[in-house]
């Protein structure tokens, strides 16, 4: 596969490169020993009582509400593979799970069920706990688990961040070791990013949102960059793809103006958003890469743009307008695009 010079790729779930798995697992095992765990230990079979679990779910209501439909879609992709989809909070406590009936009993034997903590300090090396510690997608397969009891599992997990980049939970697919598939982690990563985008759009529903990508057909998809601004142009936040395309961490972006980030004056872009909703324009990133962008402002009646601003729509705006087709569910086929920019 080739990569077109000067074109931003799609962001991986982790901004930093994935660590070498051998080192990652060795460090996780060392931490497991340091907290006093023994490989021969029997898993804790005492989940939170129902009232405590309900309270925990309520405290994580936004995560739970936005993750549930994504979990159902993900489970539909792996049904009948002796697997289950698991959602945890930021501490690794399972909030919800969906699984194949023939695997649920096996999962219960290792306490893989709601209300149980799968933090690394409680379960040793495992995909959920280790992904949360490392802050990156993680696979832990069979004998790589620290506790022998968990070596019947193969697990793929990705952390979930809130719209400000703080880890608030994790999404995991765990199953029988015989059902291991190398593409499972890709599905989990895509699903976690979908949850993050839903959380982002909900958090900034009343903000000015800029949807952008180097390729017009990716606007409105999982892979688009999203940047949110207050009506006065103050930068609020950006999703993973936007951070990757802009090439800067969130803290650095918060110190910059719209014009510094996109090469255009914010009032002009906002005016186009208000007067020609759905129209696309071309913006320039700090790297010099030109991207297709579409503004969105859900509460235009609450804001009056400065007088005298003209709409700066380009002559090719109609041609650049992305397809209105609904997004397809997460599938392996959608992930394997043959394009390095989708990696």
Question: What kind of feature is each model-predicted range?
Answer:
Residues 1-142, 152, 161-164, 168-232, ...:
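Intrinsically disordered, low-complexity terminal regulatory regions
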Residues 70-78, 130, 244, 260-268, ...:
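Amphipathic alpha-helical regulatory segments at dimerization interfaces
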Residues 101-103, 242-245, 299:
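Short, surface-exposed beta-strand-loop junctions and turns on beta-sheet-rich folds
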Residues 143-144, 152-157, 262-324:
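PAS-family sensory/regulatory modules and their coupling/dimerization elements
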Residues 171-204, 219, 294-343:
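Sensory coupling linkers of modular signal transduction proteins
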Residues 198-264, 319-343:
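Signal-transducing coiled-coil/dimerization helices and immediately adjacent hinge/linker segments
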